[in-house]
Amino acid sequence: MAQNDTPVKALVLAGGGARGSYQVGVWRALTELGWRPQIITGTSVGSLNGAMFALDLYETARDMWMSIRSQDVMELPEENADLSELHAFLREVVRDGGMDVTPLEEIVERVLDEDALRASPIRFGLVTVEKRGLKPRELTLEDIPAGKVKDYLLASAACFPALRAKQIDGVQFLDGGYRDNMPTALAQKMGAEELVCVDLEGVGITLPNRTGLPTTMIRSYWELGDILHFDPDTARRNMELGYYDTRRAMGYLRGCAYAVSTSAESCEDAAAFAWKFQQVQKAVREKYPVTLTADAALLLANMKDAQLAPLEAAAEDAGVDPTVFYTTRTLAEAFLEKCDRERIESFAPLFEGSGNAAQAARAALLPNTFLQALVCRALTKRRDRKSVV
C-alpha cells in the first residue's frame, strides 16, 4: 500500500495502432474523476500514449490525435499514384522490411522530453520484442539507457511487418504486441496493487491477467477503426467513446453501447420502458411466436443492462450516434427520430391482433427490424404506466 493506505494504482494501456485515440478519452475521464495512477505501463501505441500521460500532456496528446493522418505516421504512396507507382512502393516495402516510420519518429521527437519523463512522479514501463527469437523485453525507465527512451518507445510500436523493425545498438526490435499487448504483469512487478486496463482489441497476443489484482477493464462496444488508418474524424469519435466508456466503467453511467444517465429520473424512465416492452412482448407472444426472433436479436447484441438492452440494440440498428450523453428519454427520442417508421409499421397488425402467418414469418426473417418495431410500440403506445416519451 501507498503511505496513505490507498492502493498503488496502475494504468495499463494496450496496443492497437490508430485506435490509440480511444485512450486519450479514457485519460480525460480518469483525470476528471480524480483517478491518478502512480504507474503506467504500455505496449505499442499504448506506450506512446502512456509516456504523454505520464508527462501530463493531455492537450498535446489530444491535439496530436486530432490532427494526424496516416501519411503523418508512415511514408505512403501519393493518393493519385498510378498502378506502376503502387507496385514500386510495395516492392520497396517488402525489400526494406516494412513501411518507413520517419514521420512517426519526428512526432515522438517533437512531443516527448526524456528528461521530463524520467523526472515524472509517475513510474513508466513498456514492452517490446527482440526480433531474433521473439524475446519479450519488459523495460522500466530505469532499465533504459540515458538518451534511448524515444528509441524504445518506437521499438514498442514497430508493428512489423507493416512497419519496419526498430534497430537499437545493433539489435532489431518489434512491436511489443507480439508477446504481451496488455502488460499487466509488468505493472504488478513495478508495484501496482490496483489496475485500470484499456483494451483496443489490436492485433497481437493479449495474455490472461493472472495478477490477481483488482482490475477495471475498459473496452469499447463499438468498432474503433483500422489499426493503420489514422484519421481526425475517427480519432474524435474514439476519444468520445473512450471518455464515456470510462465513466461507465467507474459507475457514473449506465448502458452498454450508449452513455446513459444514472439520474433518478432516467432510471425511473428505464424501468418504465422495460415494463412497457415486456407488456408488448407478452401481448404479441400470446398470439404469435415471433417475439422469439427479437430475443435472438438481443442475444446477438450482447447488451448487459437488462432494462435498457432492447432500446440500446434498436438504437444501434437504427444508427443512433453513440458519442453523445443521453438520458433514457433522450435516447428513446433519438431512436424514434432515426428509425424507419414506415418499415416497422408494417408489423402493426401483429400488435393489433390482425396479423397473419406471412407477417409473422417476415418478423422471423427480420429479427432486428422486428425488435425495432417492438421498441417503437413500447415507446409510443400509451399504457397505465409512466410514459418514457
Language-model-derived ranges and their functions:
Residues M1-T43, A51-V389:
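Patatin-like phospholipase
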